[in-house]
Amino acid sequence: MTEKQQNSQQPSQLDSTASISALPPQLQQPAAGITGAPGNAEATTSEPPSTKRPRKAIESSEPLTEVILRRLTTIKEGDTVLLRLPSDLVKSVVVQGDNLVQLGKYGAFPASQLIGLHYDITYEIVSSSGSGASTPQPQSLDFSTEETQSKKGNKKNKNKGKDTAAVSKNNPGWNNILRPLKRQLVVDAVIDDIVETNEFIEDLSETEKTTLSHDEIAELRAQGCTPEEIIQAQIARHEKFGLKTDFSKEKWRRRKEKKFYQTVQPLAPSIPNVLYHYNLRSPQSILHLRDDTLSQLLTMANVRPGGRYLVVDDTGGLITAAVLERMGSEGSILLFNESDSPPAWGILQTMNFSDRELEPIKWLNWLEAEEEYQKPAPPVQAEPPTNPIKAAAKQRKYAAQVAELNNTRNELHLGGWDGLILATTLNPISVVARLTPYLLGSAPIVVYSPYYQVLAELLSWSKKDPNYLNDTLTESWERTYQVLPGRTHPMMTTSATGGYLWNATRVHPSQFQPESHQRFKRRKTGKAPGKEQLSSVAKDEEAVNESLEIDPEELANEGE
């Protein structure tokens, strides 16, 4: 029997309604292995963990949709921006006007150049003198090397790729600017019209090639030639370029563009872009969660605006950010944490949610979630305080924290939550069993794990519990295909698995047991489960009949 039916939503893709602004001090905790790692323009400063709970944002008359739209479209100072490089790698930088963004061989530019620009537009790094080419950084700062360093290498080279006072003063990157890149049209050839083939192209060694050498390319850069002019010079020196097919020419050209162009593309702070960045840099910090699995998780959990969800998140805030983005910051999210400090919401910082957008999020640690828990009183001072005003302020602060904690606990214990989402390293059986009583009937429950065995045990346990209906274990799978005219093949570097999902529907089991169930149990066990009950009922009936029997002699005596 269920109490409530929910209108399920089936979005085909992850929503991209995200935005950018500063986080409150309580949330400024970088995720492990991401913020401040080599390759960032600078280390993100954060305050030490605080036991204070985030206060409610100040009411604003501006529509929330306008806040989200502005965050999603325009870069502001203080934002964390993901820059896509020509090598398809992604670098996270913090936009501050007095910093220099260094990208190794892809050049450098002042961070202030990003302020006011729009996302998802490719910009070229050029010199402000009008020469059309920027000065590349030393090869030791090559970003492609930074991206493949191990954790030990990150510790040894923690200052690598960051701004220092000596570099910032003399770096020619301060003279560079960003301007939108004008690309040439992609070759749109028809299969039937192709005359050229690769039949007469021979593989030559490096010494036999007639293309520009490294020294000649460096000389052209020193003369101020643009990347397009360098590519045209390469084409002019390529003897057999005309023998290539149109597709080979385009592939060759794009390969040279990645080599010579100095471009950046600011990526909008949406869940797909953030997920792509974290899968490249630190997939273990998000439990190897993939975009297709995340979209399935949000769909199974029926996440919608105005919903109320319990979330256990060990992915650095990825699940929380995805739920908050899908909700449009309308509803309520209650997180559970193992420590007394707020969770490490590094991805929320990368998403640059504003105070107003983070207002639906509340959190409790597992001890505070107990119904019998009471917050201990502050220690009593043996001596009277020297400053009564300061002591009174501390008492008011403590009372406000206790009141906010009690409100959050009451909200949990009153129940009525619309769903439960887990992506944690904890035992899912204990977590699901503990939080299920607070869910509404028909509320979906979704658990993610990168390991099959963990969810297999959960499935075996839930099959025996009448509180869970239609519990299933699924695995999502996707593969990227390269589609060209007349040819299609999959990309061979696709990950093997995207993890596993267990989902079920919360129901309230009925105490009524139909007679058909009793007969089925009797056939299955070979016993008559109702014999004792029937014998007791028969005895009761005999007692009632005896009490109702009338003695004829007593009746005659009463008549006399």
From Swiss-Prot:
Gene3D superfamilies: 3.10.330.20
Main location as per UniProt: nucleus
Domain of life per record: Eukaryota
UniProt-annotated location(s): Nucleus
Pfam families given in the database record: Gcd10p
Bias type Acidic residues, positions: 548-560
Purpose: Substrate-binding subunit of tRNA (adenine-N(1)-)-methyltransferase, which catalyzes the formation of N(1)-methyladenine at position 58 (m1A58) in initiator methionyl-tRNA.
Family recorded in the similarity comment: Belongs to the TRM6/GCD10 family.
Assembly with partners or alone: Heterotetramer; composed of two copies of TRM6 and two copies of TRM61.
Full protein name: tRNA (adenine(58)-N(1))-methyltransferase non-catalytic subunit TRM6
Source organism of this protein record: Cryptococcus neoformans var. neoformans serotype D (strain JEC21 / ATCC MYA-565) (Filobasidiella neoformans)
